[in-house]
Amino acid sequence: MSESNVKHLISWEDWSDSEILDLLDFAIHVKKNRVNYAGHMSGRSLAMLFQKTSTRTRVSFEVAMTEMGGHGIYLDWMASNFQLSDIDLEARYLSRNVSVIMARLKKHEDLLTMRNGSQVPLINGCDNMFHPCQSLADIMTIALDKPEIPLNQIQLTYIGVHNNVVNSLIGITSALGIRLTLVTPIAEKENIHSQTVERAKAKGTLSWEENLKKAIQNADYVYTDTWLDMEFFNDPSYADKKKQRMELMMPYQINSSLLEKTNAKVMHDMPIHAGYEITREVVLGPRSIIFQQAENRLDAQKAVILKLLEA
């Protein structure tokens, strides 16, 4: 496989609508037929490079490789030479030893540099601009929750801060025809991927709403996320920014009172800061599909690995 022919998952920008739909269908197939893929990664290794903290991404990728007969290698950025060397050169070496690489980095630009050096498929396990694997599991969860309803009839409402998860949600929903409404009181320009937004606007799948009641009244799903990036949440140097954000965003909390105005089910990509963007009562309540959503990361990761190595 030459470098020019290697397929990566950095964002949905490099995937066609039909490729995204095919990947979604395949992820659902893998979940329903896990035993059929028990040995597909035999003799193969996945390098997992972490610059950001993780629970779900590490667990799901490592378990995915184990269940498929392969091996997941955990690499801590600070304990590796990625922190010392040119990223593309380290990636060029690493890709000579493994079949696929997953990287969870702070800067999207670093992931692009890593892609330029990798001779094997590179998966974005989350960066500051995109989180494609999360959005695949999100839509997989919706498709499994309402299999009788075509995706282009689904209304998804996101309430929170415009971030990497939102960019990936915009990309995948526009590809699949899902209507996405954003209620994003905080939407800083540097966090918005304009190409992704413009494509969705052109397709008519994306809209914005300031009235919270109007945004949720016809929603099938209400989705929220942390109001401050996880690596900064407990950082004392961000205390003032955190305080300002919490005060601004508290009226947009997902709570029982808000849910009285909608029949929507509730989603969150985790980790959760209960009492801020969502109450613990809602997280554990009957409308929550948050843990199904998190569980589906496992089969979504399997599907991504298998598809990229098949390409």
Curated annotation (Swiss-Prot):
Record-given protein name: Ornithine carbamoyltransferase
Family matches, as Pfam families: OTCace, OTCace_N
Chief location bin: cytoplasm
Pathway the protein takes part in: Amino-acid biosynthesis; L-arginine biosynthesis; L-arginine from L-ornithine and carbamoyl phosphate: step 1/3
Subcellular location: Cytoplasm
Listed EC numbers: 2.1.3.3
Binding-site residues, carbamoyl phosphate: 54-58, 81, 104, 131-134, 268-271, 279, 297
Record family assignment: Belongs to the aspartate/ornithine carbamoyltransferase superfamily. OTCase family.
PROSITE patterns, per the entry: CARBAMOYLTRANSFERASE
Binding locations of L-ornithine: N164, D225, D229, M230
Organism: Leptospira interrogans serogroup Icterohaemorrhagiae serovar Lai (strain 56601)
Reactions that this protein is recorded to catalyse: carbamoyl phosphate + L-ornithine = L-citrulline + phosphate + H(+)
Annotated transmembrane regions: none
Lineage top rank: taxon: Bacteria
GO molecular function, one term: ornithine carbamoyltransferase activity
Function: Reversibly catalyzes the transfer of the carbamoyl group from carbamoyl phosphate (CP) to the N(epsilon) atom of ornithine (ORN) to produce L-citrulline.
An individual GO BP term: L-arginine biosynthetic process
Keyword Transcription: no
Key words, A-Z: Amino-acid biosynthesis, Arginine biosynthesis, Cytoplasm, Transferase
Enzyme class name: transferase
A GO cellular-component term linked to this record: cytoplasm
Site positions (Important for structural integrity): K31
